């Protein structure tokens, strides 16, 4: 074989080694076939001879065969002396393979490896980067304390190597040296600090791993490199991403305040709506002050989001745990889709992902409810996957989906996998405990399972029924009698013990059956399982105390049998019971209370998820999987009450930028920044910090100069950002002035558009919009003042026009007022059009034009029909005389433009006054908000009152659960909106309708064919039926056979376009176009039967 036949590449060495090993087997001498009977003395002798040969081709062939043996898992350690002699070979291919071998066996053959240490040291200076890296790997694999100084020196030199591959191996060597000699920690930290500043993506993951192993508590080393790591994250290799994300998760928990308080505080602030002006002002101030996300916090969340699409399951899981632990709860929902995608992987990945989903679904059900069907069990799933899916389905069960889940569970009970069937029965029991509405249904189903042929199913059903009956023992005497009959057929000890315990607890309710059961059990006492024997003793004791005449002798007989039982637990229990229930001279005071002790009411067992207590472990870790703290686990710290100084993450700025700034500039910027809303500061500053490391550093440095601003990091104004870019553009020279300005303004516009998009996402209030309009004025003023005197007169006039136009436009923005009746008029909401990068003056002139001249206008209109149908909120029987009904008035909600208005009518059907009617505890899905009505002091007998509420359903038909309370009672009530009430009617032209419909195609379009009598397809009938189901507006149509309706969703403002196209005969096609595909599908299902019926 020639030396060029198998070129060895370090990157793919493992795969080639395997192939070489396969070829090697064919060249072994025939005697190797009888290796079982031959002597081991001459084993591998041919390889040793080839390694000692003078020919490089023979040596290379031998090394390939040896590496092939290693790849197959065979022991090649006896060849170490022969291999190590070739470490100084001049052939680069041989040297690479020798180092691969030495890395594997240097730790086992330390003495022989030490003989060649001088060769390794020389190799550290080799021109080939692979040889330098391999030499360092071998050197760090020789775990002998005597060479620690040599290793330390080699690591320091390698950390400054020009090759990032060598620096990467230096980071790997740090961990090995630290485990060999922990006393080198301080010197190694210096190397880690140096490598953390490395800008190569190849080094980042390895050095962070070294940091986690050596000094995970040295958070100060991360400060200056935090933004760089966030920006490099997407380009780092996959396994490095995992390590970095876990480290940054811990870092964020120590450096930023909790983002989870925001929603709670806003919800609390919304409770007291009608208050005095002073109180309202205090509430508004509170709403603004509590929490603003740090731009660096936002940077981390935004830069990890793309990694949810990674092909590596570990990366996706790492990002998911980061979002779970440090992102606002409203943003954590995006991880659910990615985690569900991982369920298509192999079973090992599924197991870990399902465990993490099980933990998440306990705290935030809403995240995974849309993907309920993804957790249905498949026949091909292994048992461990099936039980985890059952756990998740149980956690996601609620009143809305329990009927579907119970049908699914019925199928699972019939499974051939008995362990899975038993787990399903346990799940049904938990559902019955958690959802009281289906407790009786589940109990009846479990009783039916008692007649199942499979004994394991019957036994598990008995155990679960016993737990359910403890919740309501007085109501189910018949079930207890039925279970008593099963004692003759059931042999599973746990089930027999459960039946005996139930009979003993309810012996007074079944006085005739209990003694007979005890008689039967006395006959078979000696052959029963220990668990059953204990319950027989308990049953005898309880009957002795309640029915002594019939069972006294029987109990004494059982106690005598227990006295001589082989199990010491049985004997101990027998002595205890005898002393307690059979009075004698030696009996103490306890015997007086024997009845209270044995027949005391026991609390019902609490059926909880086994994943309930795992949330204190970081998701995705070994500790979370095992539910025990593993070696090396680093706990997540609690959020700090006050955020540490954010300036520690600022990188030093270059001196040039400081010198160029004109005098007085900083003052103007400071005064302008006072007008900025907090949400704008957060979004824009985080945007600019993500552009590049140098930009984030320089901008942070400028902020550090100002000294007066603590928390704000960067400028948030679109005009000031374009101004800064244009000023930096002028430095390049007068001839490039115009070009640089044009580019900088275009960039400023795109940045501002990004900022606006993020502001929409963060749902900024109207007050922040007012502030942003004042920012525009102030920033345009500062820009016009900073223009140099050399600018032309026409430019100055243009600036004045722009300023005047903006000032004219500013008063149009106004605060929302409760008494402002104009809010009920149709609100004009123009369709957003893409903004080209125009000059500021032209932009100002265009913005000053009236939008009414545009042909593309979509505005909210008044409802075409208001249904009078009411829904029962609280029945008078359930409400102890208080009845409540609600309906949807289809008018704009005065409590918020994203809320659906609801009117509730309360009736007092009693002959007494009902006092203090108010809303109590709210159990709303994630993201949903509710504005409650003011408490009603009293409601007279036969009196009635109507109140208004607002609920933001987040464009979903999820149920809003809350408590309607009086002075004495609280009642659980639910409001589930019809999908048609989540819409606002809009007025638009046929042209605009077709244009929008052309955009919303593909997955955004759902359709169905309707069959009905011709008289049901007249325009008036179609109109009446559609507006009765949904709050939509009619769109003028130029064709008689096509009827169009349009609306937008209340929460997000997404268009909902409905088309009814009449076909030949008695058929029609119903088409719905919308981005909200779920709502569109539900609306289609509701409209189809209404349009079909006569």
Swiss-Prot record:
It comes from the Eukaryota. Residues 1-31, 268-292, 662-811 are annotated as: Disordered. GO terms for molecular function: GTP-dependent protein binding; protein phosphatase binding. The keyword Lipoprotein does not apply. One of its GO terms (cellular component) is microvesicle. InterPro entries: AP3_beta, AP3B1/2_C, AP3B1_Ser, AP3B_C, AP_beta, ARM-like, ARM-type_fold, B-adaptin_app_sub_C. Residues 1-11 have a biased composition (Polar residues). Ubiquitously expressed. Belongs to the adaptor complexes large subunit family. GO terms for biological process: anterograde axonal transport; anterograde synaptic vesicle transport; antigen processing and presentation, exogenous lipid antigen via MHC class Ib; blood coagulation; cell morphogenesis; clathrin-coated vesicle cargo loading, AP-3-mediated; establishment of protein localization to mitochondrial membrane involved in mitochondrial fission; granulocyte differentiation. This is AP-3 complex subunit beta-1. The keyword Signal does not apply. The modification Phosphoserine is found at residues 276, 609, 750, 752. It comes from Homo sapiens. Keywords: Albinism, Cytoplasmic vesicle, Disease variant, Golgi apparatus, Hermansky-Pudlak syndrome, Membrane, Phosphoprotein, Protein transport, Transport. Its main location: membrane. Subunit of non-clathrin- and clathrin-associated adaptor protein complex 3 (AP-3) that plays a role in protein sorting in the late-Golgi/trans-Golgi network (TGN) and/or endosomes. The AP complexes mediate both the recruitment of clathrin to membranes and the recognition of sorting signals within the cytosolic tails of transmembrane cargo molecules. AP-3 appears to be involved in the sorting of a subset of transmembrane proteins targeted to lysosomes and lysosome-related organelles. It holds the Pfam family AP3B1_C.
